[in-house]
Amino acid sequence: MKNITFIFFILLASPLYANGDKLYRADSRPPDEIKRSGGLMPRGHNEYFDRGTQMNINLYDHARGTQTGFVRYDDGYVSTSLSLRSAHLAGQSILSGYSTYYIYVIATAPNMFNVNDVLGVYSPHPYEQEVSALGGIPYSQIYGWYRVNFGVIDERLHRNREYRDRYYRNLNIAPAEDGYRLAGFPPDHQAWREEPWIHHAPQGCGNSSRTITGDTCNEETQNLSTIYLRKYQSKVKRQIFSDYQSEVDIYNRIRNEL
């Protein structure tokens, strides 16, 4: 037991526990299962395709979870942590029934929001240091993973051969300002009348009037989040196409020179 504790504290102090361009998620599912799923998808993603249930892409609802502490069945976000240490602590708490689980190392991207930065003093669990991924995390965005056996993190980082650095190398999580409109506080929540959210309140939220179509605060937040996600997905698709076109151009140039 002393050896396990010693190893644990060495890992806590090591550089692999903090990396500004990487995030971490503890998950019971092995890499091959994550790959078959297309990545780390939100629970609401499966509900949407299986039952047609609309995903709830409300950050405040996501951060609160359910009254029992579990993930919402219609959740449109995937939780990650800022550090390996935070992910490990989360794993030891929520995955304590598993002798083996994994901590996935994930590249940052603009569909991710620092929950504490966006929700401020109204963040329900600030100690979790959570960064939430709107719409999920593709398998190509997963840099690699650590195995955790009986609470001890394997020192070896298993690299994901399908990670695409060129798609994500220059991407960061979204600035807090981008997330204020998507915070998802209830319509009459006092945050909408306070800094900084008062300047970003969607129509129908706080003192803002409803939209011309009569959308409620929650509906407008859902619409704005959907638009934000689609813009991000389009950006990544353009990057993928651009890289593919560059490779084709290089191939054609080499072929012409031969």
Swiss-Prot record:
Domain of life: Bacteria
Keyword Disulfide bond: yes
Gene Ontology terms, MF aspect: toxin activity
Record InterPro entries: Enterotoxin_A
Active site: 128
Cysteine disulfide links: 205-217
Function: The biological activity of the toxin is produced by the A chain, which activates intracellular adenyl cyclase.
Name assigned to this protein: Heat-labile enterotoxin A chain
Species per Swiss-Prot/TrEMBL record: Escherichia coli O78:H11 (strain H10407 / ETEC)
Underlying gene: eltA
